[in-house]
């Protein structure tokens, strides 16, 4: 029995990619801890006041960079790990939302999805700048709530024979 409409399947697939050139570009962008941009020189002062730093300048353009937030850096590190492990179907961006139930509010944003030959990995990432203690009882409970529905959806799209594994990854939490 189909759980998703063709529109929902298309919406999920729009946030996934298996295009080698797109994956290579994404990998290069994600493996650096900095977000970089090329801007016109007349925009430079505004960006510098927002915490960006100037890397280089040419006649009309400036290259600037800013350290990515810790949560984005951690998600990027996990994404790159799966890419380095040979996974070639990965989420394109961090806007992948998967409907897991019948109600319209039964949707969950997924940080990293990696589809392999035999398995699909669904990763929820939590990171903090400074080491601190935390209990993730609420987050684990939420995963238990949507796990079965997300598994059904991913198997419907990528094949019933695939195993779906959930990972709760943390950085700087004890």
Residues covered by each model-derived region:
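Intrinsically disordered, low-complexity Ser/Thr/Pro/Gly-rich regulatory segments
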Residues: 1-174
């Amino acid at each position: 029995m189909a759980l998703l409409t063709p529109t929902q399947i298309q919406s999920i697939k729009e946030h996934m990619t298996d295009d080698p050139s797109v994956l290579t570009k994404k990998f290069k962008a994600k493996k650096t801890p900095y977000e970089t941009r090329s801007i016109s020189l007349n925009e430079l002062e505004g960006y510098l006041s927002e915490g960006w730093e100037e890397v280089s300048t040419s006649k009309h353009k400036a290259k600037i960079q800013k350290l990515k937030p810790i949560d984005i850096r951690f998600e990027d590190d996990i994404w790159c790990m799966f890419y380095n492990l040979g996974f070639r179907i990965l989420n394109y961006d961090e806007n992948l939302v998967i409907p897991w139930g019948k109600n319209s509010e039964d949707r969950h944003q997924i940080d990293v999805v990696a589809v392999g030959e035999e398995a699909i990995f669904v990763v929820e990432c939590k990171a903090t700048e400074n080491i601190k203690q935390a209990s993730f009882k609420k987050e684990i409970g939420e995963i238990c709530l949507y796990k079965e529905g997300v598994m059904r959806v991913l198997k419907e799209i990528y094949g019933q024979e695939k195993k779906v594994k959930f990972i709760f990854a943390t950085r700087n939490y004890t």
